[in-house]
Amino acid sequence: MCSTERLLFILKYGIAYVRFHKEINGKIEFIEQKHIMRYQQMFAALTVRNKIDEGINSGVIWHTQGSGKTALSYYLTYVLADYFSKQNKVAKFYFIVDRLDLLKQASEEFEARGLIVKTASSRAELMEQFRNNQAQEGNTGKPEITVVNIQRFAEDRSKVELPAYATNLQRVFIIDEAHRGYKPEGSFLANLLDADKNAMKIALTGTPLLKEERESWRVFGNYIHTYYYDKSILDGYTLKIIREDIETQYKERLSEIYEKLEILVEKKDVKKSQIVEHDNYVKELLRYIISDLKRFRQIQGDNTLGGMVICETSEQARKLFAYFDEIQAELNKDASMKSHLRAGLILHDSDDKDTRDKIIDDFKNNMTVDILIVFNMLLTGFDAPRLKRLYFGRKLKDHNLLQAITRVNRPYKENHYGYVIDF
């Protein structure tokens, strides 16, 4: 591990000063923290460099969720910029995501480490960057990375035309969450990657690629480097996850309410989804969730621990939020339950972006929101170490399930586990 070559590699590329805000004595302050490249990040970066020497310019890096793939991407910008400079080439980096919230999170992580982040809000803006044939868009002289939300261009299937290639420019595409629905032919991303045959293409994933997905991602080739769940847990970068069933009494009440509502549904022309949106069902669900999170905090002796509810429908999410304070007031009549939880609702069509960002920040950093109520948002890429209790109100499968449950696997204080409660 500590050979001279590796030690020099870490000293040259593997130290970052990360700026973030943290609550200190009741105040939010900005602090800088020195981060050292983790060993799996070092081996991945070394392997990428070795693959280029072998003439391989694409591949997949599978590092388990929560092990620092965005940080790895940051280190790669320095490693590869230096590598290509020795070949009289200037590297230009693109970080590709497929969600708006992931664009924001990745941008913040890169900026916290000192990278200048550029974004492209339209196809025209992105194409203008390509036409410039410049490694840097700004004039600061600091390292840059362009973060692109490919979802903006999902319906754009037109061919991407690039100007005559600048022989000293080396484009590097880093594609985040490589396991998700990418079609190797006909999409804007495929056309973009295909337009520059000389570009490096590094696909990141936190979950294994299934057989059909490996076929879909054949454009990236084989695994460059892997770092599995068991190693991440042993190394202390992620926590084990425990699945819990809901208490029998609540399970029986919810089943009884569901069965009664189901009978009503059969008599009327009503969608079954409306059962889980019914006031009676929602209120009983809230009684369990609020009581459970409060007891969990009492047992752990930590009132900073947070929760998240993944709802069956967006309407159910709205109702859970609407009835939250009412049900909490009812439960607070019991002295053992008399503490106050604050809920935040995160839906793509609820509130504006600034309001949603404020709610998320209040949960992650300010600790003025204790439980998030969601439907589709924040199930991937959301990194909040205090989140330790995840309530599944609906079924998720395959990668969506793996992505969601790993929201609770980040180390936090003295916690040894993240918990998933399955309804």
Task: Walk through the language-model features, giving the residues of each.
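SF2 helicase catalytic motif II
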Residues: A164-K201
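Conserved helix-turn-beta segment of the N-terminal RecA-like "Helicase ATP-binding" lobe
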Residues: D101-E125, Y323-N332
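ATP-dependent helicase/translocase motor core
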Residues: M1-V97, D101, Q105-I116, G141, ...
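Inter-Walker segment of RecA-like/P-loop motor cores
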Residues: E111-S158
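Interdomain helical connector at the RecA1-RecA2 junction of SF1/SF2 helicase-like NTPases
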Residues: R214-T304, F321
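Conserved RecA-like P-loop NTPase helicase motor core
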Residues: V172-F173, H179, R342-F423
